[in-house]
């Protein structure tokens, strides 16, 4: 969408539309009664670990203070938008258990929540800055800007705009507009920026005018840059606190100058230290395992991923394993956030997931969810398999504490749970000459018990019964039974295998492996 101009002015219809949007501005910040925070990713890619961490800390802060968590999509870089990314970002937040209160999907009082649908607001703000002299039109061509960059590089200087168009006279501007010369709008950076207090980094000051040229705030296609858009949107959405990555700390001075030029009260800022790999290197999208979708498809629980992310950072009195989102909300304190980068050790994720999966298996409602998920996984892997929910639930309870992921049950070592192994009589008889006697003792034990065993009582009964086998060590008898039941020499205890398979299936397998 290209903005409409009449000799450099926005069309009056645009002003009317924007004024209507402006009326939706919330008033809670002025009253000081409501905390409102936002997570504002760009759908130029899918949600990654760094983004999830920023979203999580915003969510925790909002819920800790009874406030609102907003999802806003910064989709103004139209050339880099990735199809499906916008929808996926919100999907991943919902999967993680930190759903936004206001978003493109759910709406809200301060929408729309995509920047591409809020252009009128940016146009009005840009015009206000032009009218007050806080911004100006820049007619410099891309070729001239490239020459400036090359010259700076040649002199080993940081490239910066030389603010040339800042000094154009009104007559010169009028002449260029009359020729329909393309332009962008730049913000007039004032020297001597005032210090501000960041809620994490403390008092900070960056005189951006001394190191940067005047920044572009509205591009030639009518879309804003981040600097203008985030200020306008945070104001109109009445954001009370901005929690974002530390990479934006230096730019905050620039944003505060924009707030001042527009006559708006700024929110409070808290910049979160970067999330890095455990060796201190930057998280890279080339790693493959940086995207949240990877962990969803790999069978990890969202609780485990959030738990790991908060354990590697700060914001809590102490680190603990096994914390749920509700616990994180209770324990989170923004003031305890460190300025040191957070080192993420993804090698610990399986152990975090084991702890949370154990808790899910113990919970009645969450166990039902796991049973349903496992049924779907089994159906995809074993097309003709028919298992009742009670059978699957029994397996989960028996394997509680041993599984790192639900998908572990689809690995070859657990295949015996779902398909009968191929075992020959010769394989078993080479383990002991009393193979048939061992089998008959265990089959009779299973047939004669109607009340059911626990793992402990079955272990005791097996040991008692197998004392009748005089020439076979107990360990050899266990190995024989394990191979007959599973086709494997190693794995869970024989008692657990018998309980997992159930009485009838266990008897069938033993008799098939060692027919009379």
UniProtKB/Swiss-Prot annotation:
GO terms for molecular function: ATP binding; glutamate-tRNA ligase activity; glutamate-tRNA(Gln) ligase activity; tRNA binding; zinc ion binding. A motif ('HIGH' region) lies at residues 43-51. L-glutamate binds at residues 38-40, 74, 226-230, 244. Its EC number is 6.1.1.24, 6.1.1.17. The keyword Repeat does not apply. Gene3D superfamilies: 1.10.10.350, HUPs. Keywords: Aminoacyl-tRNA synthetase, ATP-binding, Ligase, Mitochondrion, Nucleotide-binding, Protein biosynthesis, RNA-binding, Transit peptide. A motif ('KMSKS' region) lies at residues 282-286. It is found in: Mitochondrion matrix. The keyword Calcium does not apply. GO terms for cellular component: mitochondrial matrix. It is an enzyme of class 6 (ligase). ATP binds at residues 48, 247, 282-286. NCBIfam families: gltX_bact. Belongs to the class-I aminoacyl-tRNA synthetase family. Glutamate--tRNA ligase type 1 subfamily. HAMAP family: Glu_tRNA_synth_type1 (MF_00022). This is Nondiscriminating glutamyl-tRNA synthetase EARS2, mitochondrial. It comes from Xenopus tropicalis (Western clawed frog). The lineage of its organism: Eukaryota, Metazoa, Chordata, Craniata, Vertebrata.
């Amino acid at each position: 969408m290209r903005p409409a101009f009449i000799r450099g002015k926005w069309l009056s219809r645009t002003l009317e539309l924007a004024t209507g949007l402006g009326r939706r501005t919330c008033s809670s910040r002025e009253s000081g009664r409501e905390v409102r925070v936002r997570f504002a990713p760009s759908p130029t890619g899918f949600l990654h670990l760094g983004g999830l961490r920023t979203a999580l800390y915003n969510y925790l802060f909002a819920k800790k203070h009874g406030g609102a968590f907003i999802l806003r999509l910064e989709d103004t870089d139209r050339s880099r938008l990735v199809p499906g990314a916008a929808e996926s970002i919100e999907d991943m937040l919902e999967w993680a258990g930190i759903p936004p209160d206001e978003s493109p999907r759910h709406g809200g009082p301060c929408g729309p929540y995509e920047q591409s649908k809020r252009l009128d607001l940016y146009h009005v703000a840009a015009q206000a800055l032009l009218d007050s002299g806080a911004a100006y039109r820049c007619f410099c061509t891309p070729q001239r800007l490239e020459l400036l960059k090359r010259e700076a590089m040649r002199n080993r200087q940081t490239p910066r705009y030389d603010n040339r168009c800042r000094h154009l006279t009104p007559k010169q501007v009028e002449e260029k507009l009359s020729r329909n010369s393309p332009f962008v709008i730049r913000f007039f950076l004032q020297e001597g920026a005032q210090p501000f207090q960041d809620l994490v980094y403390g008092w900070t000051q960056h005189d951006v005018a001394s190191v940067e040229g005047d920044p572009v705030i509205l591009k030639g296609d009518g879309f804003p840059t981040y600097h203008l858009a985030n200020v306008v949107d945070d104001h109109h959405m009445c954001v009370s606190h901005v929690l974002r990555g530390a990479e934006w700390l230096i730019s905050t001075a620039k944003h505060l100058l924009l707030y001042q030029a527009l006559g708006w009260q700024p929110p409070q800022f808290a910049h979160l230290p970067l999330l890095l790999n455990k060796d201190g290197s930057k998280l890279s999208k080339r790693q493959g395992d940086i995207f949240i979708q990877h962990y969803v498809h790999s069978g990890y629980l969202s609780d485990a991923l959030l738990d790991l992310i908060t354990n590697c950072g700060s914001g809590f009195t102490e680190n603990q394993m096994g914390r749920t989102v509700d616990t994180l909300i209770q324990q989170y304190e923004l003031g305890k956030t460190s300025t040191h980068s957070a080192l993420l050790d993804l090698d610990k994720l399986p152990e975090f997931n084991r702890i949370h999966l154990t808790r899910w298996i113990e919970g009645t409602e969450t166990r039902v969810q796991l049973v349903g998920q496992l049924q779907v996984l089994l159906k995809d892997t074993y097309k003709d398999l028919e298992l009742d929910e009670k059978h699957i639930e029994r397996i989960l309870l028996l394997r509680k504490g041993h599984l790192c992921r639900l998908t572990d049950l689809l690995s070859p070592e657990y295949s015996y749970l779902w398909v009968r192994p191929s075992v020959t009589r010769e394989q078993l008889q080479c383990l002991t000459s009393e193979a048939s006697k061992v089998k008959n003792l265990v089959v009779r034990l299973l047939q004669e018990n109607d009340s059911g065993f626990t793992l402990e009582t079955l272990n005791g009964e097996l040991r008692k019964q197998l004392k009748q086998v005089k020439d076979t060590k107990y360990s050899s008898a266990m190995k024989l039974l394990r191979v007959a039941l599973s086709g494997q020499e190693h794995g869970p205890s024989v008692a657990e295998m018998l309980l997992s398979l159930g009485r009838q299936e266990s008897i069938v397998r033993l008799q098939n492996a060692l027919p009379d």
